[in-house]
Amino acid sequence: MKQEPHRQSEEKEKPKGPMAVEREHHTSLSSGTTMTASTGDESTNSRPVESSQTEKSLSLRIRILKQLGFDDIQELNACDTGLVEQFLNVRLINDTKELEKIRESNLAKLNQIIDKCMESDKISDSTLNKILDMSMNRDTNNDNNNHLTIPSPITTKKRKINASELASPRGHRRYRSDIPTVSEVETGVGYPQIHQQPGAYTLPMPANQWMSNPYMQPPQPQVQQIMPQYLYPPGMGPQAQLPTMSSNSESQTPVMSSQFLSLNQHGLYQQNIGAHPVMSMGPQANIYGQQHQPQPGQERDQSRKSFSHRRSQSANISMANFRSPMRNPQPASSQRPVNFLIHTPKHPPPT
């Protein structure tokens, strides 16, 4: 019976709460070895730091909840971090909605003011434009101050395109699409077109003053004589007369007959230029209207072809010995073949 009041007195002397439990644990460990005592000291040093951090975070959350409008914080769990974040998001959404309402009200007021200014005669349009320009400049300045100016690739490209052409000699580039097209009517210059109209065929006429010197006669183009098919019926047209060869015909060329008179009388050279005549060649006619005959100069030189020079053979050209029937209907005299070879001491003329 004496031991029970002693136990009750010991229980009264013991403090209550978590701190008392820690003290009892500490006293119990202190009775052990030295190692257990040292570990107990480290745990007591770390726990006060953690408790201080948790107390600070709780105080901040309580303040935030009070600012959000929650007075009865005891009903909420302040230790729950997700709950506080949700309340913060709701507060941000409400603030943005209020800002939008204020902006809409300001715009409505501005519209009313502008309408009244337009209706009144005292305020002119120039003053309104000045006010609008001032507001626009203020907005642009605010945007430039708030945002960083970063050069975009679009602006750099425009600067390169609009750069001056004097920077480099290769800067001036013109394309075919940039060159304006000019018509022939504006310039007054007409370019010849192919096959516009058929041309009239004329025969060459050699010069009389060059008949004496065979080496000074100019070369004449060989013009093809065209026999019209529609002027004469078959078998009734003029026939080409063949020349007769004599013993001394080495230096003579065949003489044309007077068929040009009959052709001229029937109107060979008086055809319509704009028409397209149908013409054909005779079966046995060459470019001069005669039968092809070997040249006598070539027959004479067959025996000494191996001894003569090559240039002397290719330079002999027989010229036409007749005039145009339009100018001189009489047959012209015969002439020698023309040699256009330029003779030198190294290459003398043929003998």
From Swiss-Prot:
Any GO CC annotation of this UniProt entry: nucleus
List of residues that carry Phosphoserine: S152, S168, S314
Record's keyword terms, sorted: Activator, Cell cycle, Cell division, Mitosis, Nucleus, Phosphoprotein, Stress response, Transcription, Transcription regulation
Subcellular location: Nucleus
Protein's UniProt keywords contain Transcription: yes
Induction remarks: Expressed periodically during cell division. Regulated by the SBF complex which is one critical regulator of the start of the cell cycle.
Annotated spans, Disordered: 1-56, 237-256, 280-351
Protein name: Transcriptional activator POG1
Modification after translation (UniProt): Phosphorylated by CDC28.
UniProt feature, compositional bias: Basic and acidic residues: 1-27
UniProt GO BP: cell division
Protein family according to the UniProt entry: Belongs to the POG1 family.
Compositional bias annotation for Polar residues: 28-56, 241-256, 287-296
Function of the molecule: Transcriptional activator which promotes cell cycle recovery with CLN2, after pheromone induced G1 arrest, probably inhibiting the ability of STE20 to activate the pheromone response pathway. Binds the promoters of genes that function in cell cycle regulation, cytoskeletal organization, and spindle assembly. May also be involved in stress-resistance.
Statement: the UniProt record of this protein carries the keyword Transcription regulation: yes
